[in-house]
Amino acid sequence: MDMLVFAGASVAKIAVVMVTVLITVAILTLAERKVLSWMQDRMGPMEVGPYGILQPIADGIKLFFKEDIIPAGANWVLFSLAPIISLIPAFIGFAVVPYGPNIEYELYGVTIKPFIISDINIGILYVLAFASIGAYGVILGGWASNNKYSLLGGLRAAAQVISYELNVGLAIIGVLILAGSLSLVTIAEKQAGGFWHWNLIGGLQIIGFVVYVISSVAETNRLPFDLPEADSELVAGWMTEYSGMRFAFFFMAEYANMILVSCIASVLFLGGYHAPYPGTLLPGILGYFEGVAWFTVKVYFFLFLFFWIRATLPRLRYDQLMRFGWKVMLPLALANIVITAIVVYVLR
Amino acid sequence: MHALLTRLAERFPDAVLAVREEGPYKDLVAQVKPAAVPEIARFLHDDPEAAFDMLSDMLAVDYPEDEDRFEVIYLLKSLPRNHRLRLKARLPEDDPTIPTVTTVWKGANFLEREVFDLMGITFAGHPDLRRILMPEDYDEGYPLRKDFPTEGRGWRSTFPFLPRLDEPAAPMASEVPEDQHRPFLKEAEGLPKDTKAVRRQEELLLNMGPQHPATHGVLRMVLELEGERIVKATPDLGYLHRGVEKLCEGLAYQQIIPHTDRLDYVCSMTNNYAYVRAVEKLLNLAVPPRAEYIRTVVAEMQRIIGHLFWLGTQALDIGAMTVFFWTFREREVLLDIFEKLCGARLTLNYYRIGGVDSDFTPDLVQRLGAFLDTFPAHLHEYDELLLTNRIWLARTKHVAVISAEDAVNFGCTGPVLRGSGVAYDIRKAEPYGAYDKVEWEVPVGKNGDTYDRYWVRLEEMRQSAKIIRQCLAQMPEGPIIADAPQIIPPPKQKVMRDMESLIHHFIIFTQGFKPPKGETYCSSEAPKGELGFFIVSDGGPKPYRMKIRSPSFVHLGAFDHMARGYLIADIVTIFGTYDVVMGECDR
């Protein structure tokens, strides 16, 4: 009975989270086009529905009904597998993200946390591990297409992911030192009580924050680090030979990854579901949703940042990307660890 | 007689057959023996008084009736001395061979290949004499020869080398037939098939284009890569070759103007201008001052459009997409003005031989003024995004560097040459229009890298705005087209009412006008560089031969030189920095 209740509650939570993420992906495809358009003095999609709000649905239908092409020389097993390898890790990471206050309910004798699928104590490690697996999708997709542009894109992706994942991992160590835990819930809980308790401000994790944000832009292959895709050089990089739903899988994975790194960023540095003021304004159960709302606002702030950067910056070159990753970001991240460790040691 | 010609005749008494000054503009012409061309070219290049450091263009003219059928013409330009010379050599039909001048001017490489391709003249000693505009296995002859029909030989389905659409595709063992494997690796040629050890195995042959998002049309580039680094880049041109030069031989002079629109379709007005100026030079026709001012204003508007287009696409290639949309926003304003002016937006057709088609209206002048008022602020907007952007600097500084010496030797002109620090602008060197009546400067770069060329073009837009403003202020009243009834038809209103004018109009448009026998080369400063028209007139209503000196074509000759050693990502930067338009390049 206990197992059944636990499984039922988990499935329900997973369903809610998955649907939310998928809807957010759909919103993002439109939001990105709209935000870019406004920054570029144009209107963006306007044809499908009022102000083009039904555009994601039209895109989805189009991609769904497109012919599925596997190139003659491609390795079809890996070619079909790659989009799946890309997509699944992108979604799996959401299992450990706390969306709302850390509350517990007793349901038929089973303790349930409604705002997180699973509060495992190595949450952040789990996210990083699955993010690395996602990179295999890109590399395999590039290799299996049997196309030189795809191969170059895949190789670039491999190099880029290795360089920048390292920086992501090192950038958050400062936060982990402050929280003393790898659990995202614990990290969020430690930042309760107003914005001066957030790791970014109270924990003085400014360097870590900057390194994390830049590295996560690189990890999600977004401009100015979209070298694996690099549409003006490599046509579409590793996605050159993909069409229809396989392409849509890669596309969804990219956006899901963006959402995931935004969620992690807001939990690690901006206090997650905590409001910038102590406590909540709304009483009781509404207060929980106030937390969820704050979390959403923070995530969308990061997502907007992605679009904003894309509209502003040109693309880096491969060697510049590597130099930037290893010679600028890595030393900064290491310095952050050293300083944080010393400060924490002295103050305790 | 010009001192230079005397000097040349004295230096090479045997090789120089004749020297003369031709036409009303006293063009310097030297007729020489073909075998002596490299020697004379070397002398003209090295001699401090001649100093012909640039080979503007070269072409061949076919005279089937003459004993020596072909005439190869080298159009030389000296930047330090600012004079031009036409070097001519006659070749017989049975052995049309002439030594190459690639040893003197590196830019001759592509130009000689073009002459070989279209006229069938062999250049002895040329490093890579292949067809350039026609397909490499084209077997139907040489299109610009007079015995080649204008409509061409055969049509699509009769050419064995083109795939048939109505038959199933023949199965191929691999994408590249065995015998064509690695045709671009010159070093490997002449060796047995299995000797692969001469080259390192890591090199990757990447075919970029003709369908590629960043090649600005249908340019194909075969890259040999070592990792992401370019070992060799071979441009493959001709996908947009329409035989404009051949077509023009069958058209009356006025009918050619619309064909020039389609050359550089981004800046069609400039092409019109360059062409009508060449014809006017041939006719020795003076243009009224108001028309000169209007032409200058419109040409500068077109230059701003061309540079905006370039800036947008170059930025987009490098990944800064916002600049692209912003430049198109400003371009739109100018296109609207063009629409007011002549009814079209892209393939504009406004210049006429002897003047322009219609006068400026006050509304148009007011709109143009309003544009000029806001334009500096918009330029500032682009600067904010790019000028000091660290990533932009890293992507453009020290990329595709070409030294001033090399740039001149390759025949680069326009912003590409000025980016290398050579202040050569035809508007200053050989003033036309109203350029000598207004105040403006020629911006020059220092390092000859992509950033300098970017800076030069942005500065040129500011100068263009300045020129337009001054021209609008100074513009005199008066007619907008020359008074030459032999050449210029009466105004349309009179034609519709008046019998004599109708006859006059009819005669000019059915018979054309007949310029005097002669040749002329006239170059103009297009946004891409020196756009020249060389016209040979036999006294008839149609040009006997017309050669277009296209800056994009000449610039692509320097591509390999500029691309070697850079990364794949830089290829798109280099494409962009030339501002190539394939319509003009392939003609």
Predicted regions and their residues:
Chain B
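Metal/cofactor-centered catalytic core regions of large enzymes
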Residues: 164-587
